[in-house]
Protein backbone atom coordinates (compact mmCIF):
# COMPACT_ATOMS: atom_id res chain seq x y z
CA UNK A 1 0.00 0.00 0.00
CA UNK A 2 0.91 3.64 -0.09
CA UNK A 3 -0.32 7.22 -0.06
CA UNK A 4 -0.84 9.22 -3.23
CA UNK A 5 -0.77 13.00 -2.97
CA UNK A 6 -2.91 15.17 -5.26
CA UNK A 7 -1.88 18.81 -5.00
CA UNK A 8 -4.15 20.18 -7.73
CA UNK A 9 -6.19 22.18 -5.20
CA UNK A 10 -3.08 24.04 -4.10
CA UNK A 11 -3.55 26.28 -7.12
CA UNK A 12 -3.09 29.83 -5.84
CA UNK A 13 -0.86 32.42 -7.46
CA UNK A 14 0.21 33.90 -4.13
CA UNK A 15 1.96 37.04 -5.34
CA UNK A 16 3.19 38.68 -8.54
CA UNK A 17 6.10 40.95 -7.62
CA UNK A 18 6.31 43.40 -10.52
CA UNK A 19 9.25 45.32 -9.03
CA UNK A 20 11.53 42.31 -8.61
CA UNK A 21 10.11 40.31 -11.56
CA UNK A 22 9.14 37.35 -9.40
CA UNK A 23 6.02 35.29 -8.80
CA UNK A 24 5.17 33.04 -5.85
CA UNK A 25 2.91 30.09 -6.65
CA UNK A 26 1.53 26.89 -5.23
CA UNK A 27 2.30 23.63 -7.07
CA UNK A 28 -1.19 23.04 -8.47
CA UNK A 29 -1.20 26.16 -10.64
CA UNK A 30 -1.64 25.30 -14.33
CA UNK A 31 1.35 26.53 -16.32
CA UNK A 32 -0.73 28.36 -18.93
CA UNK A 33 -2.81 30.03 -16.19
CA UNK A 34 0.40 31.37 -14.67
CA UNK A 35 1.65 32.59 -18.04
CA UNK A 36 -1.58 34.43 -18.75
CA UNK A 37 -1.67 36.00 -15.27
CA UNK A 38 1.83 37.45 -15.54
CA UNK A 39 1.34 38.43 -19.20
CA UNK A 40 -1.52 40.68 -18.09
CA UNK A 41 1.12 42.65 -16.20
CA UNK A 42 3.58 42.72 -19.10
CA UNK A 43 5.68 39.87 -17.73
CA UNK A 44 6.68 36.47 -19.09
CA UNK A 45 7.31 33.00 -17.67
CA UNK A 46 8.96 31.19 -20.62
CA UNK A 47 9.18 27.50 -19.57
CA UNK A 48 6.12 25.95 -21.22
CA UNK A 49 5.81 22.27 -22.18
CA UNK A 50 3.48 21.36 -25.00
CA UNK A 51 0.99 20.35 -22.31
CA UNK A 52 1.01 23.82 -20.74
CA UNK A 53 -2.79 23.96 -20.81
CA UNK A 54 -3.04 21.02 -18.40
CA UNK A 55 0.33 20.51 -16.69
CA UNK A 56 1.07 22.11 -13.33
CA UNK A 57 3.99 24.10 -12.00
CA UNK A 58 4.59 21.36 -9.43
CA UNK A 59 4.92 18.77 -12.16
CA UNK A 60 7.17 21.07 -14.17
CA UNK A 61 9.40 21.50 -11.12
CA UNK A 62 9.51 17.76 -10.44
CA UNK A 63 10.59 16.98 -14.02
CA UNK A 64 12.61 20.13 -14.76
CA UNK A 65 10.34 20.63 -17.76
CA UNK A 66 11.56 22.46 -20.84
CA UNK A 67 9.48 23.13 -23.91
CA UNK A 68 10.03 25.12 -27.10
CA UNK A 69 11.38 28.33 -25.50
CA UNK A 70 14.17 26.58 -23.60
CA UNK A 71 16.53 27.19 -26.51
CA UNK A 72 16.59 30.93 -25.71
CA UNK A 73 15.35 31.26 -22.15
CA UNK A 74 16.26 28.00 -20.41
CA UNK A 75 14.33 25.23 -18.68
CA UNK A 76 12.27 25.31 -15.48
CA UNK A 77 15.33 25.04 -13.23
CA UNK A 78 16.69 28.29 -14.67
CA UNK A 79 13.64 30.20 -13.39
CA UNK A 80 13.47 28.86 -9.83
CA UNK A 81 14.77 31.07 -7.02
CA UNK A 82 13.38 29.40 -3.91
CA UNK A 83 11.22 26.43 -2.93
CA UNK A 84 9.19 25.51 0.11
CA UNK A 85 9.60 21.75 0.53
CA UNK A 86 8.11 19.25 2.95
CA UNK A 87 10.77 16.66 3.71
CA UNK A 88 9.97 12.97 4.25
CA UNK A 89 10.23 13.38 8.05
CA UNK A 90 7.68 16.22 8.01
CA UNK A 91 10.11 19.11 8.36
CA UNK A 92 9.31 22.15 6.18
CA UNK A 93 12.26 24.03 4.70
CA UNK A 94 12.97 26.76 2.17
CA UNK A 95 15.79 25.75 -0.14
CA UNK A 96 17.22 29.10 -1.25
CA UNK A 97 16.57 32.84 -1.25
CA UNK A 98 14.43 35.24 -3.26
CA UNK A 99 17.49 36.67 -4.98
CA UNK A 100 19.01 36.37 -8.44
CA UNK A 101 22.43 35.60 -6.93
CA UNK A 102 23.10 33.08 -4.19
CA UNK A 103 26.54 31.67 -3.42
CA UNK A 104 25.65 30.51 0.08
CA UNK A 105 26.06 26.82 0.82
CA UNK A 106 24.97 23.91 -1.33
CA UNK A 107 22.33 24.60 -3.98
CA UNK A 108 19.39 22.66 -2.58
CA UNK A 109 16.99 24.41 -4.92
CA UNK A 110 18.56 23.00 -8.06
CA UNK A 111 18.83 19.60 -6.39
CA UNK A 112 15.09 19.44 -5.70
CA UNK A 113 14.11 20.60 -9.20
CA UNK A 114 14.08 17.54 -11.44
CA UNK A 115 14.18 15.04 -8.56
CA UNK A 116 10.79 13.61 -9.61
CA UNK A 117 9.28 13.68 -6.13
CA UNK A 118 11.93 11.38 -4.67
CA UNK A 119 13.42 13.88 -2.17
CA UNK A 120 10.49 15.95 -0.90
CA UNK A 121 7.14 17.57 -1.66
CA UNK A 122 7.18 21.07 -3.17
CA UNK A 123 4.41 23.20 -1.64
CA UNK A 124 5.40 26.68 -2.82
CA UNK A 125 7.81 28.15 -5.38
CA UNK A 126 9.31 31.57 -6.04
CA UNK A 127 9.95 31.88 -9.77
CA UNK A 128 11.84 34.40 -11.84
CA UNK A 129 10.08 36.36 -14.59
CA UNK A 130 11.27 38.41 -17.56
CA UNK A 131 9.62 41.27 -19.47
CA UNK A 132 7.10 40.05 -22.04
CA UNK A 133 8.47 40.43 -25.60
CA UNK A 134 6.37 42.84 -27.63
CA UNK A 135 6.89 41.20 -31.01
CA UNK A 136 7.21 37.68 -32.44
CA UNK A 137 7.80 36.34 -35.94
CA UNK A 138 7.13 32.73 -36.94
CA UNK A 139 8.02 30.75 -40.05
CA UNK A 140 7.53 27.15 -41.21
CA UNK A 141 10.43 25.93 -43.33
CA UNK A 142 10.05 22.75 -45.44
CA UNK A 143 12.94 20.59 -46.68
CA UNK A 144 13.25 17.75 -49.16
CA UNK A 145 15.94 16.17 -47.02
CA UNK A 146 15.73 15.46 -43.27
CA UNK A 147 19.48 15.71 -42.79
CA UNK A 148 19.60 19.13 -44.45
CA UNK A 149 16.88 20.32 -42.08
CA UNK A 150 18.84 19.09 -39.06
CA UNK A 151 22.08 20.62 -40.33
CA UNK A 152 20.35 23.98 -40.75
CA UNK A 153 19.65 24.09 -37.02
CA UNK A 154 23.24 24.58 -35.88
CA UNK A 155 23.86 26.92 -38.82
CA UNK A 156 21.22 29.36 -37.53
CA UNK A 157 23.17 29.83 -34.31
CA UNK A 158 26.47 30.11 -36.17
CA UNK A 159 24.88 32.98 -38.10
CA UNK A 160 24.46 34.90 -34.84
CA UNK A 161 20.75 34.31 -34.24
CA UNK A 162 19.23 32.81 -31.10
CA UNK A 163 15.60 31.95 -31.92
CA UNK A 164 12.99 31.87 -29.18
CA UNK A 165 11.98 28.48 -30.60
CA UNK A 166 13.39 26.15 -33.24
CA UNK A 167 11.35 22.98 -33.67
CA UNK A 168 11.86 19.94 -35.92
CA UNK A 169 9.11 17.76 -37.41
CA UNK A 170 9.78 14.97 -39.85
CA UNK A 171 7.17 14.32 -42.55
CA UNK A 172 5.52 11.46 -40.67
CA UNK A 173 5.02 13.70 -37.63
CA UNK A 174 3.06 16.25 -39.63
CA UNK A 175 1.13 13.54 -41.48
CA UNK A 176 0.01 12.01 -38.18
CA UNK A 177 -1.18 15.41 -36.94
CA UNK A 178 -3.06 16.23 -40.14
CA UNK A 179 -4.66 12.79 -40.14
CA UNK A 180 -5.89 12.67 -36.56
CA UNK A 181 -6.20 16.21 -35.17
CA UNK A 182 -9.20 18.39 -35.98
CA UNK A 183 -8.68 21.99 -37.05
CA UNK A 184 -5.09 21.63 -38.25
CA UNK A 185 -4.35 22.41 -41.89
CA UNK A 186 -1.24 23.18 -43.90
CA UNK A 187 -0.29 22.54 -47.52
CA UNK A 188 2.69 20.21 -47.91
CA UNK A 189 4.51 19.35 -51.14
CA UNK A 190 4.73 15.66 -52.03
CA UNK A 191 8.53 15.66 -51.82
CA UNK A 192 8.77 17.44 -48.45
CA UNK A 193 10.51 15.25 -45.86
CA UNK A 194 10.83 17.56 -42.84
CA UNK A 195 9.94 20.97 -41.44
CA UNK A 196 11.57 23.45 -39.09
CA UNK A 197 9.31 25.80 -37.14
CA UNK A 198 11.34 28.90 -36.29
CA UNK A 199 10.29 31.74 -33.98
CA UNK A 200 12.11 34.91 -33.00
CA UNK A 201 10.93 37.39 -30.40
CA UNK A 202 11.91 40.81 -29.12
CA UNK A 203 10.76 44.40 -28.79
CA UNK A 204 11.66 45.90 -32.16
CA UNK A 205 9.97 44.77 -35.38
CA UNK A 206 12.80 45.99 -37.60
CA UNK A 207 15.35 43.92 -35.67
CA UNK A 208 13.17 40.83 -35.94
CA UNK A 209 12.78 41.32 -39.68
CA UNK A 210 16.55 41.43 -40.07
CA UNK A 211 16.81 38.26 -37.99
CA UNK A 212 14.23 36.58 -40.22
CA UNK A 213 16.19 37.59 -43.32
CA UNK A 214 19.33 36.07 -41.83
CA UNK A 215 17.49 32.87 -40.93
CA UNK A 216 15.96 32.68 -44.40
CA UNK A 217 19.43 32.97 -45.92
CA UNK A 218 20.65 30.08 -43.78
CA UNK A 219 17.68 27.95 -44.77
CA UNK A 220 18.22 28.64 -48.46
CA UNK A 221 21.86 27.59 -48.10
CA UNK A 222 20.52 24.25 -46.85
CA UNK A 223 18.18 23.80 -49.82
CA UNK A 224 14.89 24.60 -48.14
CA UNK A 225 11.63 24.76 -50.07
CA UNK A 226 9.18 27.67 -50.05
CA UNK A 227 8.96 29.20 -46.58
CA UNK A 228 5.59 29.98 -45.00
CA UNK A 229 5.48 33.11 -42.81
CA UNK A 230 2.65 33.38 -40.26
CA UNK A 231 1.23 36.88 -40.70
CA UNK A 232 -1.60 36.89 -38.14
CA UNK A 233 -2.14 35.65 -34.60
CA UNK A 234 -4.49 32.97 -35.96
CA UNK A 235 -1.87 31.76 -38.45
CA UNK A 236 0.75 31.62 -35.69
CA UNK A 237 -1.57 29.61 -33.47
CA UNK A 238 -2.31 27.27 -36.37
CA UNK A 239 1.37 26.52 -36.92
CA UNK A 240 1.99 26.03 -33.22
CA UNK A 241 -1.00 23.70 -33.01
CA UNK A 242 0.54 21.65 -35.81
CA UNK A 243 3.67 21.17 -33.71
CA UNK A 244 2.09 20.83 -30.27
CA UNK A 245 -0.39 18.16 -31.29
CA UNK A 246 2.06 15.69 -32.83
CA UNK A 247 2.46 13.79 -29.58
CA UNK A 248 -1.28 13.62 -29.02
CA UNK A 249 -1.87 12.30 -32.54
CA UNK A 250 0.69 9.53 -32.13
CA UNK A 251 -0.22 8.53 -28.59
CA UNK A 252 -3.97 8.46 -29.19
CA UNK A 253 -3.77 6.28 -32.27
CA UNK A 254 -0.99 3.75 -31.78
CA UNK A 255 0.91 1.45 -29.47
CA UNK A 256 4.15 3.34 -28.98
CA UNK A 257 7.21 3.92 -26.80
CA UNK A 258 8.50 7.47 -26.53
CA UNK A 259 12.10 8.43 -25.93
CA UNK A 260 13.32 11.92 -25.00
CA UNK A 261 16.87 11.90 -26.31
CA UNK A 262 19.01 15.02 -26.25
CA UNK A 263 22.39 15.70 -27.89
CA UNK A 264 24.50 18.76 -28.69
CA UNK A 265 22.59 20.38 -31.54
CA UNK A 266 25.30 19.75 -34.14
CA UNK A 267 24.86 16.00 -33.55
CA UNK A 268 21.14 16.02 -34.30
CA UNK A 269 21.51 14.78 -37.93
CA UNK A 270 23.57 11.79 -36.78
CA UNK A 271 21.11 10.91 -34.02
CA UNK A 272 18.15 11.00 -36.40
CA UNK A 273 20.01 8.80 -38.89
CA UNK A 274 20.86 6.30 -36.13
CA UNK A 275 17.23 6.09 -34.99
CA UNK A 276 16.13 5.25 -38.53
CA UNK A 277 18.95 2.73 -39.00
CA UNK A 278 18.10 0.92 -35.75
CA UNK A 279 14.43 0.91 -36.70
CA UNK A 280 15.19 -0.64 -40.08
CA UNK A 281 17.16 -3.46 -38.43
CA UNK A 282 14.57 -4.22 -35.77
CA UNK A 283 11.54 -3.71 -37.99
CA UNK A 284 9.83 -0.75 -36.33
CA UNK A 285 8.87 2.68 -37.61
CA UNK A 286 9.42 5.88 -35.66
CA UNK A 287 7.93 9.36 -35.62
CA UNK A 288 10.56 11.96 -34.73
CA UNK A 289 10.06 15.58 -33.73
CA UNK A 290 11.20 17.92 -30.99
CA UNK A 291 13.10 20.94 -29.82
CA UNK A 292 15.86 20.96 -32.41
CA UNK A 293 17.35 24.23 -31.19
CA UNK A 294 18.61 22.56 -28.02
CA UNK A 295 19.15 19.10 -29.55
CA UNK A 296 16.12 17.50 -27.87
CA UNK A 297 14.66 14.86 -30.21
CA UNK A 298 11.45 13.06 -29.22
CA UNK A 299 11.46 9.58 -30.75
CA UNK A 300 8.09 7.81 -30.84
CA UNK A 301 8.69 4.15 -31.67
CA UNK A 302 5.56 2.66 -33.26
CA UNK A 303 4.63 -1.00 -32.72
CA UNK A 304 2.57 -1.21 -35.91
CA UNK A 305 2.30 -4.80 -37.14
CA UNK A 306 5.11 -6.19 -34.99
CA UNK A 307 4.16 -9.30 -33.05
CA UNK A 308 3.83 -8.81 -29.30
CA UNK A 309 6.71 -11.18 -28.60
CA UNK A 310 9.02 -9.30 -30.98
CA UNK A 311 7.96 -5.94 -29.53
CA UNK A 312 8.59 -7.05 -25.95
CA UNK A 313 11.86 -8.85 -26.67
CA UNK A 314 13.54 -6.55 -29.19
CA UNK A 315 12.36 -3.10 -28.14
CA UNK A 316 14.59 -2.85 -25.02
CA UNK A 317 17.62 -3.87 -27.10
CA UNK A 318 16.82 -1.26 -29.75
CA UNK A 319 16.35 1.45 -27.14
CA UNK A 320 19.64 0.54 -25.50
CA UNK A 321 21.39 0.91 -28.86
CA UNK A 322 19.81 4.33 -29.41
CA UNK A 323 20.69 5.52 -25.90
CA UNK A 324 24.25 4.21 -26.12
CA UNK A 325 24.76 6.11 -29.36
CA UNK A 326 23.12 9.21 -27.88
CA UNK A 327 25.55 9.22 -24.96
CA UNK A 328 28.49 8.65 -27.32
CA UNK A 329 27.53 11.90 -29.07
CA UNK A 330 27.76 13.80 -25.79
CA UNK A 331 24.04 13.53 -25.08
CA UNK A 332 21.92 11.84 -22.45
CA UNK A 333 18.74 9.82 -21.93
CA UNK A 334 16.22 12.56 -21.23
CA UNK A 335 16.12 16.26 -21.98
CA UNK A 336 12.88 17.10 -20.19
CA UNK A 337 10.61 14.08 -19.56
CA UNK A 338 12.62 12.52 -16.75
CA UNK A 339 13.38 8.90 -15.83
CA UNK A 340 10.62 7.56 -13.58
CA UNK A 341 10.27 3.80 -13.77
CA UNK A 342 10.34 3.19 -17.50
CA UNK A 343 13.80 4.61 -18.25
CA UNK A 344 15.41 3.42 -15.04
CA UNK A 345 16.92 0.25 -16.62
CA UNK A 346 19.02 2.42 -18.94
CA UNK A 347 20.62 4.69 -16.33
CA UNK A 348 23.83 2.62 -16.42
CA UNK A 349 24.40 3.90 -19.96
CA UNK A 350 24.61 7.52 -18.80
CA UNK A 351 26.23 7.06 -15.38
CA UNK A 352 29.02 5.01 -13.85
CA UNK A 353 28.48 2.86 -10.74
CA UNK A 354 30.22 5.55 -8.69
CA UNK A 355 27.87 8.25 -9.98
CA UNK A 356 24.79 6.13 -9.35
CA UNK A 357 25.94 5.28 -5.84
CA UNK A 358 26.48 8.98 -5.13
CA UNK A 359 22.89 9.64 -6.20
CA UNK A 360 21.69 6.85 -3.90
CA UNK A 361 23.56 8.47 -1.01
CA UNK A 362 21.81 11.77 -1.71
CA UNK A 363 18.46 10.00 -1.83
CA UNK A 364 19.21 8.16 1.40
CA UNK A 365 20.19 11.35 3.24
CA UNK A 366 16.84 12.95 2.38
CA UNK A 367 14.67 9.85 2.63
CA UNK A 368 16.25 7.03 4.69
CA UNK A 369 12.92 5.19 4.91
CA UNK A 370 12.43 5.21 1.14
CA UNK A 371 8.86 6.56 1.25
CA UNK A 372 9.10 9.22 -1.46
CA UNK A 373 8.31 7.76 -4.89
CA UNK A 374 10.05 4.48 -4.03
CA UNK A 375 11.79 2.75 -6.89
CA UNK A 376 11.78 5.78 -9.18
CA UNK A 377 14.79 7.16 -11.10
CA UNK A 378 17.60 5.02 -9.66
CA UNK A 379 18.24 1.39 -10.63
CA UNK A 380 18.70 -1.10 -7.82
CA UNK A 381 22.15 -1.08 -6.28
CA UNK A 382 24.50 -4.02 -6.82
CA UNK A 383 25.75 -5.93 -3.76
CA UNK A 384 28.45 -4.14 -1.80
CA UNK A 385 27.29 -0.58 -2.47
CA UNK A 386 25.20 1.69 -0.30
CA UNK A 387 22.03 -0.38 -0.34
CA UNK A 388 19.97 0.30 2.80
CA UNK A 389 17.39 2.26 0.84
CA UNK A 390 17.28 -0.19 -2.04
CA UNK A 391 16.81 -3.15 0.29
CA UNK A 392 13.84 -1.38 1.83
CA UNK A 393 12.07 -0.84 -1.47
CA UNK A 394 13.16 -3.93 -3.40
CA UNK A 395 10.02 -5.88 -4.44
Give a label for each model feature:
Residues 127-131, 137-142, 148-321, 325, ...:
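C-terminal substrate-recognition/cap domain of FAD-linked oxidoreductases
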Residues 91, 344-395:
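Activity-critical C-terminal alpha-helical subdomain
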Residues 18-21, 139, 306-308, 341-348:
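Short beta-alpha connecting loops at secondary-structure transitions
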Residues 327-339, 363-364, 368-372:
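Alpha-helix capping/hinge segments and adjacent helical runs
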